[in-house]
Amino acid sequence: MREPTNRQGSPGPGEPRPPAQGRPRFPTWILWVALLALALWNVYTFFWPSSGARLNIPYSAFIQQVEGENVSSVTIRGQRVSGTFTEEVRVAGDQVLSPGDPVPPGTSPNEIRTGTQFQTTIPENSQTELVPLLQSHGVTVKIDQAGGSVWPSLLATIVPLFLFIGLMVYLGRSMSRGQQNVFSFGRSKARVYDAERPRVTFADVAGEEEAKAELSEVVDFLRNPMKYHAIGARLPRGILLVGPPGTGKTLLARAVAGEAGVPFFSVSASEFVEMFVGVGASRVRDLFERAKASAPSIMFVDELDAVGRQRFAGLGGGNDEREQTLNQLLVEMDGFEPHQDVIVIAATNRPDVLDPALLRPGRFDRQVTVGLPDRRGREAILRIHTRGIPVADDLDLEELAAATPGFSGADLANLVNEAALMAARKNKKIVERIDFDEALDKIVLGTERAMIMSEHDKRVVAYHEAGHAVAAHFSPGTDPLRKVSIVPRGQSLGVTIQAPEEDRFNYSRAYLLARLTVMMGGRAAEKLVFNEMTTGAQNDLKEATLLARRMVGLWGMSDEVGPVYLGMGEQHVFLGREIMQDRDVAEATLERADEAVQRLLREAMERAEQLLRKYRDKLDALAEALIAEETIGQEKITEILGAPPVPSAAPAAAADSV
C-alpha cells in the first residue's frame, strides 16, 4: 500500500512551501571571536600604544638625553619618535632620572620604571629642527614615511565600528526570528497531502464496504460540487468516523482525499493543546484559514476526543486550555460560509465522551461506523497486505481469515508482518501457513518462554489445560477446540484455544453458561485429580466472574434479579463520572444480584466437575499426551477425545489460559 508523502505546511495559507534544505549558514562563532579579538586589540593599543618595554617620556626630557649623548638611535614616524638610550635610565612620572639623581619625594617604588627603549611625541613642524640636532650628536636617524599615514588609525576605528553594527543587525534579526518562533506556537501543525503526491484510494481499503459507500458521497461532492449547489444541497459539514482502534479510520480519510484529488490537511487533536494558554484556539483558527484558502479541501482531525471531550466531566472541573480549543472548534465549524467546500472528517474510538455540542446538526452531523471486519472483510484485508509478500501457493487466506475473528485491519497487517519475519528468521524464500500459525500464536498468546518446570508443576498445568479442553469438547454449543498447549507463553503457563466456525454477533444464555463451564474446567480438574487448588485459575476466575456479572447486571439473564439493567460489569474510563453518577438500585437488589452471580459460578463449577468425572479417562489421556508432546493440535485432540456429542454452534473465539 502506498502512503502519500507528507510534508510540513507553510505558515501561510495556500500551497505549502517545503522547508529549505542545504542552505548555508554563517557560523556565528567566527563573528564573536573576531569581535572579541578586535575589542581586546583596541583596549591594548589604548592603554599600551607600543611595546610594554618602551618608556613614555616628555619631549623636553628627550632633548636633554640627546644633548647628554645618551641616545643612540631613533625612528621618526610622523610626530611619533621611538628610540634606544645608550645607557639605562629611570623614569619617575614625567621626569627622566640619570644615574645618581634622587627620586622625587612622594614617588612610590611601583611608579619608577627603568629601561633603554623609549618613545615620545614631537611638536608639529619640529622635525626639520630635530633631525640636524640628532645628527650633530651622532644619533642614528631613521625616517618612516608610512608612519605619517592616517589609514592605520582610521581602520582601527572604522573596522570595529562596522563589525559592531553588523553584530547588532545580526542579533536584531535573530531576535526577530525568535519572536516569529514564539508567535508560531499559534500556527497549526497540520501535515498537508496534495493531489500530486502518491495517494491512497478506496482500492487500498478493504473490509469496510458500508463506510466506503457512505464516504463515496463526499468524494462525488468534491469532484462535482456544482451538481449539489445547483439544487441547493449541502454536504454535512462534519463527518465523524467512529470505531475501535486499528479499524482504518485514518486510512479511510486519506482514501477520500486520494479519490477526490484535493488537498488533505491532517492533524492530531492533541497537537492543538500546548503549555501556553490560547495556543490551541489559535491553531484551530489557523488550520481552518488554511483549509479555506485551499478549498475544496479535506481537514482530518485524528483522535478527536483529545480536545472534544465533554466539558467539566469528572472530578476537579475541566481543563481551561482544552475547553478554549473546543469552543473555538465549535465556532469554526458552525461559522463556515455557505458552500465553502471544506469538509471536516474526524476520527475517534470514544464517541461516548464527546461533547454533545460537537454532535449536533451543523457540526459533526453524520457518523460513520468503522467496525471490525467480518470474515470476508478479513480475507480481503489479508489479500491487500500479502500483495508484496511471496506466499506459498497453497496458502488459504479464507481459512486464515476464519482463524482470526475479532482482528482489526491493523491486527491483520501485524499478523502478515510477523509471519514474514518468522519466515525470514528461518531463511525461507516464501511465507508458508506454518509461519502464519506461529505468528498468530505469538500475537494472541505471547512469545514462548524458556522455563524449567518441575514434573509436578508440569503435571498440574497439563491437567488444568486438559480440564478446559474436556469441558469445552463435551459442553454443547461451545466453540470447537483448535489447540491445547502447556508451553509457557507471555504471562500464562498453558493455553486452550477455541476457534469459531463463523462470526457471531449475538450470544445466547446457553452459550454463555457453556463458556462459564469451560472457564471452570481447569479448577475442577485440579480438585478432581490432586484434591487441591492452585493459583493457576486466577485469570479463569476473573473472566468467569466478569462474565457472570454481565449476565446478571447488563443482560438480565438471572431469575433472582430478572430482566433489569443494573450497570454491573461496565468499565468506567473516568473515575469522577463513576463516583458522581446516581445509583438508582436498591441495596437489596444489589445483594440479590451478587447472590445470582455466585450461583452462576457455583453451578458452572458443578457442571465442570460432573463432566470431568464422566470423562475421566479422556481427561487422563489428554493430560498424558500434553506431558509427552506439550502442544496438541485439532486432529490429535479429536483422536483422543472423539467426536463431540452435539454439533457446536458458531460463537466468537475464546482462549482460556492459566
UniProtKB/Swiss-Prot annotation:
HAMAP family: FtsH (MF_01458). It is an enzyme of class 3 (hydrolase). GO terms for molecular function: ATP binding; ATP hydrolysis activity; ATP-dependent peptidase activity; metalloendopeptidase activity; zinc ion binding. Residues 1-22, 95-114 are annotated as: Disordered. Its cofactor is Zn(2+). Residues 50-149 are extracellular. The lineage of its organism: Bacteria, Pseudomonadati, Thermomicrobiota, Thermomicrobia, Sphaerobacterales. It comes from Sphaerobacter thermophilus (strain ATCC 49802 / DSM 20745 / KCCM 41009 / NCIMB 13125 / S 6022). Acts as a processive, ATP-dependent zinc metallopeptidase for both cytoplasmic and membrane proteins. Plays a role in the quality control of integral membrane proteins. Zn(2+) binds at residues 464, 468, 540. This is ATP-dependent zinc metalloprotease FtsH 4. Its main location: membrane. It is found in: Cell membrane. Its EC number is 3.4.24.-.
